[in-house]
Amino acid sequence: MEAVRFAVAVVLVFCYVTSSNAQMTSPPSGGAGGDAHSLPCIQKLMPCQPYLHLATPPPATCCMPLNEIVAKDATCLCAVFNNVDMLKSLNLTKENALDLPKACGAKADVSLCKTSAGTNSSSTPPATPKTPPASSTSTGTGSGSTGNAAPSTAKPTSSAPAINFGGLSFASAVVATLFF
């Protein structure tokens, strides 16, 4: 029984350390330009990270999600492309950030990103469907409600990783209570 308690304690400590490290690395990417809404799509691209600076062609595990994002999620593509801090953290520039899609045969149209003129504007398309309810609430300030819609859209998604890690901590506490 003592061995089981020790094993559970080790697992709980491991989960806590893992969630703490993930929380420490999450805010810089979310805080650098408000692109926290793009994190789910960034996570799909994690298999591509080793191939960012290699001449070796990336495998299908990298190219399939990358091609899907290029084809279907221009908002994510622009959020990454326009986030200079994120590119710097990966030792990329805007110019060589396009090398990976080319290696996968994807045609990334970054002219859409230039049209959106920045990371805050690139978050506007997802907020556009949510803007009419906000403007119907405050009819006199339609432009003010549009400005408020984008930050409110980014805040819930930026807190989503914290909720997930909070749930992990809560689950750890429940398991500890059951076994100890």
UniProtKB/Swiss-Prot annotation:
Lipidation, GPI-anchor amidated serine type: S158
Subcellular location: Cell membrane
Primary localization class, coarse: membrane
GO cellular component: plasma membrane; side of membrane
Propeptide, chain numbering: 159-180
Effect of a null allele: Inability to limit tetrazolium salt uptake in seeds, development of hair-like structures on seeds, altered pollen morphologies, deformed or collapsed, and decreased levels of omega-hydroxy fatty acids in seed coats.
Record keywords, A-Z: Cell membrane, Disulfide bond, Glycoprotein, GPI-anchor, Hydrolase, Lipoprotein, Membrane, Protease, Signal
Gene Ontology molecular function: peptidase activity
Record-level GO BP terms: proteolysis
Stretches with biased composition (Low complexity): 116-125, 133-156
Tissues expressed in: Restricted to stamen, pollen and sporophytic tissues. Also detected, at low levels, in stems and leaves.
Residues covered by region (Disordered): 116-156
Signal sequence, start to end: 1-22
Membrane topology field: Lipid-anchor; GPI-anchor
InterPro entries: Bifun_inhib/LTP/seed_sf, Bifunc_inhib/LTP/seed_store, LTSS
Glycosylation sites: N91, N120
Disulfide bonds: C41-C78, C48-C62, C63-C104, C76-C113
Similarity field: Belongs to the plant LTP family.
Cross-referenced PANTHER family: BIFUNCTIONAL INHIBITOR/LIPID-TRANSFER PROTEIN/SEED STORAGE 2S ALBUMIN SUPERFAMILY PROTEIN-RELATED
Role noted for this protein: Lipid transfer protein involved in seed and ovule maturation and development, probably by regulating the fatty acids homeostasis during suberin and sporopollenin biosynthesis or deposition.
Name of the protein in question: Non-specific lipid transfer protein GPI-anchored 3
